[in-house]
Amino acid sequence: RLFLADNGKSLFVTNRAGCELIKMSPDGQKMEKKVSFSSPVNAMTQDANGKLWVVCDGNYGTMYELDGKKLSVQSKIKSGATPSDILYNPLSKSLWVTQRFNNELWEIDPATRKVKTKIAVGREPVSMAAFAGDSCLLIANNLPEMPSTAYPIAVQLDMVDVLSKKVSGRVMLPNGSTDVKSVAVDKNHTFAYVTHLISRYQLPTNQLDRGWMATNTLSIIDLKARKWLTSVILDT
């Protein structure tokens, strides 16, 4: 995964196989520095003071605090079952962490590094993005919650109000949507883009090479109306 820091002047890349966070040159051509961790890096964010916060994989996941310039580790704490994403929010002045196998969103005070709030969200939250002037978080959950006998069967996205600390709404992706990987929001906070699969579970199991069973998809969410807009099939 790629992450920007220092107002877009610094580029970081996660190397999951090597359990590393790598700082690249601004043009992305050279490796300037790398930090090694005990488990694969899932995500990072930067707070208002320039510190970097990194969450790493594992049943007993870890959150690291790094000096923004030297990239030296300042502290580390245990942080739930597989913290999958982390985001600093300037309105709440806190860190928000999706806890994949806790099915929760945690708010953490960066000064004390203690959990302030736990919010129940969908099944296996894996990614998030801020919108509406940083007042809301869009949480992308990995799997559908409903039983396999239900209709439709699809992943739902959670919208969390940062100040009230409550789920303010949900958006369901098209029938068959599963295995969500990431979510991103445009600079105007008008649309969100979600990458996932659409499972063709109502079709016979043939022509697998044509994506008949699992098709890579990009779904677009209208953040003003707070509803699903359309989906683009990426496989041919």
Region roles according to the model:
Residues 5-8, 46-49, 89-92, 131-134, ...:
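Residue-level detector of Asp-centered blade-edge/turn motifs that repeat once per structural unit
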Residues 17, 58, 101, 143, ...:
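Residue-level signature of beta-propeller blades and closely related beta-rich strand-turn architectures
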Residues 10-12, 51-54, 94-96, 137-138, ...:
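Conserved beta-propeller blade signature
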Residues 1-20, 42-43:
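Beta-strand-rich domains and repeat architectures in extracellular enzymes and scaffolds
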Residues 140-154, 194-215:
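Short, conserved, GDST-rich strand-edge loop motifs in beta-rich repeat architectures
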Residues 25-29, 67-71, 109-113, 161-165, ...:
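Short loop/turn segments that connect beta-strands within beta-propeller blades
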Residues 167-176, 226-236:
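Surface-exposed loop and turn segments in beta-propeller and other repeat-based domains
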